[in-house]
């Protein structure tokens, strides 16, 4: 099992991060959340997705919108204002989905978090605001997970480079790196330092940190939730 290690505060490395996030962008990231943003976040969810510990999915929010919309706004606004995820909002069920028929070990299962609907709304709004600046802070050679870019562009580029090398008789070497569970192995403290170096406002970084720090998880075993830990 992977265990996080303390990171070194490598100032020289962090100084290489360009400060590309300006005040105008930060003002957009920090602007007060509106009911329209909350409704857009809910409308962009799949209505019949399995609920989290609260038992509510997007369909419930849509049906009861006129009754609960103001309470939702208070909850989300307080989270933004305090930079915290309050109450049980960061509680989640953990379901293991088999990757194939021969799923007989933990590495053959994909963990899926079933989160509180309030948590989903907060992170949807945050992601919606964040995606508009990804193009400005992500290098052009990063082809995946950025709207408007295609991951296969880099594949074609590598194929062309290899073809050219073979055609011209040039000597060279190709190294392929595939990091197992790369997403889970990224150091969160390091990411927060990088965000600050990019120029993200400390308030926004704290809000992001609150969303992924100190979660409470209850594994689902044979359809029943084990104790939270």
Language-model regions, residue ranges each:
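Conserved catalytic palm subdomain of right-hand nucleotidyl-transferase polymerases, strongest
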Residues: 49-56, 88, 104-114, 153-196
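Conserved helix-loop functional segments at active or binding sites
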Residues: 132, 163-167, 217-218
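Residues that mediate protein self-association or partner binding, especially
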Residues: 1-5, 42, 50, 97, ...
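Surface-exposed loop/turn segments and immediately adjacent short secondary-structure elements
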Residues: 1-107, 113, 121, 225
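Conserved polymerase palm-domain catalytic core
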Residues: 179-229
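Short glycine-rich loop/turn motifs
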Residues: 91-94, 111, 171, 214-216
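Conserved pre-motif C helix in the palm subdomain of viral-like polymerases
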Residues: 2, 107-138, 156
């Amino acid at each position: 099992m992977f265990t996080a290690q303390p990171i070194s505060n490598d100032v020289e490395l962090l100084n290489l991060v360009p400060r590309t996030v300006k005040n105008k962008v930060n003002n957009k990231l920090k602007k007060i959340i509106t009911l329209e943003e909350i409704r857009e976040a809910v409308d962009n969810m799949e209505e019949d997705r399995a609920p989290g510990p609260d038992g509510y999915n997007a369909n419930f929010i849509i049906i009861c919108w006129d009754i609960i919309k103001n309470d939702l706004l208070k909850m989300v606004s307080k989270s933004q204002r305090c930079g915290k995820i309050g109450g049980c909002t960061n509680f989640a069920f953990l379901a293991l989905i088999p990757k194939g028929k021969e799923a007989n070990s933990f590495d053959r299962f994909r963990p899926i978090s079933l989160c509180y609907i309030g948590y989903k709304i907060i992170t949807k709004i945050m992601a919606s605001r964040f995606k508009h600046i990804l193009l400005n802070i992500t290098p052009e050679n990063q082809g995946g997970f950025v709207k408007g870019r295609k991951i296969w562009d880099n594949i074609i580029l590598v194929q062309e480079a290899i073809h050219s090398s073979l055609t011209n008789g040039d000597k060279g070497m190709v190294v392929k790196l595939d990091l197992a569970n790369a997403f889970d192995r990224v150091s969160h403290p390091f990411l927060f330092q990088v965000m600050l170096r990019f120029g993200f406002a400390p308030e926004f970084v704290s809000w992001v940190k609150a969303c992924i720090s100190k979660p409470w998880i209850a594994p689902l075993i044979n359809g029943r939730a084990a104790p939270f830990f």
